[in-house]
Amino acid sequence: MSPSLVAPEPEHCPGPESEQAGQGDACAGCPNQQICASTPKGPDPDIPIIRERLSQVRHKILVLSGKGGVGKSTFSSLLAHAFSANPDSMVGLMDTDITGPSIPKLMGVESETIHVSNAGWSPVWVTDNLGAMSVQFMLPNRDDAVIWRGPKKNGLIKQFLKDVDWGELDYLIIDTPPGTSDEHLSVNSLLKDSGVDGAVVVTTPQEVSLLDVRKEIDFCRKAGIRVLGLVENMSGFVCKNCNTESQIFRATTGGGKRLAKKMGIPFLGAVPLDPRIGMACDYGESFVDGFPDSPAAKAIKQVVRAVGQLVGEDPDTVLPDDTAE
């Protein structure tokens, strides 16, 4: 039971029911500090509910990035579309970027709303085998700002995990905000007993992005999250007329491949820039299905095969290899 607080939670509050309640840096000077510190602590009673709810989800994969603007949410949508290109796979895409939800737009379902049944919240189905969940589906107006502090954001993420009726899924892709914020800590603590397969980290070639990616990888290691590998997004531009590759964002310090080697994690692949990706996202369509022979689509499919293999699946079962054609 939540303690009765005498003042609103401060920014970066760890939450009155968390193990750090009354002890975190944000607690210093808070009127609620003694109340939170004296509240009996114990295991979160919702953890077993979440574990049971997600017991039918075979693989849970986080998508992370150290810096915003590297195409993480776009890549999450591409990953979900590519996994669902196999009609035998059931795929879910959960948007935990509470204050900047973009998944509904990327998937072409931004006008949809959440439906509630006796079984829980129903995800919005993009296709027969691809569902999505986002706070955007709960807003009266798609342009409404979500101005929430940490505890409220964490509460919604908990609801997504324990109340959404995904049913049987082969893959649940969890798109997260940039950096290492409350949302990441919440997802990690709530899923620690549910068997997260690991995280795919997205970067761009420039050192300014790699700098933050190093911090993201360090966060994963400290939090006990397996890093499945690193993807370099916006890696060069291939002209569709002459097939000449140009480096738009130059890898001044060796790019993602060198960083992955230095950090001791797999390098999953490099996805080149393609303006048609942006066009497909604006229209909420699958770039992988629309332009299957493009260098970017082939690179994305190879990343999907690699991720599938890392979580214990046969890559040819995950997605047939068409690069040899």
From Swiss-Prot:
One Pfam match: ParA
Family: Belongs to the Mrp/NBP35 ATP-binding proteins family. NUBP1/NBP35 subfamily.
Binding sites annotated in the UniProt record for ATP: 66-73
Main location as per UniProt: cytoplasm
Matching HAMAP family: Mrp_NBP35, NUBP1
Native source organism of the sequence: Aspergillus oryzae (strain ATCC 42149 / RIB 40)
Lineage start: Eukaryota, Fungi, Dikarya, Ascomycota, Pezizomycotina
GO cellular component, one term: cytosol
Record region (Disordered): 1-26
Keywords: 4Fe-4S, ATP-binding, Cytoplasm, Iron, Iron-sulfur, Metal-binding, Nucleotide-binding
Location in or out of the cell: Cytoplasm
Any one GO BP annotation for this protein: iron-sulfur cluster assembly
Oligomer status and interactors: Heterotetramer of 2 nbp35 and 2 cfd1 chains.
Function: Component of the cytosolic iron-sulfur (Fe/S) protein assembly (CIA) machinery. Required for maturation of extramitochondrial Fe-S proteins. The nbp35-cfd1 heterotetramer forms a Fe-S scaffold complex, mediating the de novo assembly of an Fe-S cluster and its transfer to target apoproteins.
Keyword Hydrolase (UniProt): no
Binding site for [4Fe-4S] cluster 1: 13, 27, 30, 36
Residues that bind [4Fe-4S] cluster 2: 239, 242
Protein name as catalogued: Cytosolic Fe-S cluster assembly factor nbp35
CDD domains, per the entry: Mrp_NBP35
Cofactor note: Binds 4 [4Fe-4S] clusters per heterotetramer. Contains two stable clusters in the N-termini of nbp35 and two labile, bridging clusters between subunits of the nbp35-cfd1 heterotetramer.
Obligatory cofactor(s): [4Fe-4S] cluster
GO molecular function: 4 iron, 4 sulfur cluster binding; ATP binding; ATP-dependent FeS chaperone activity; metal ion binding
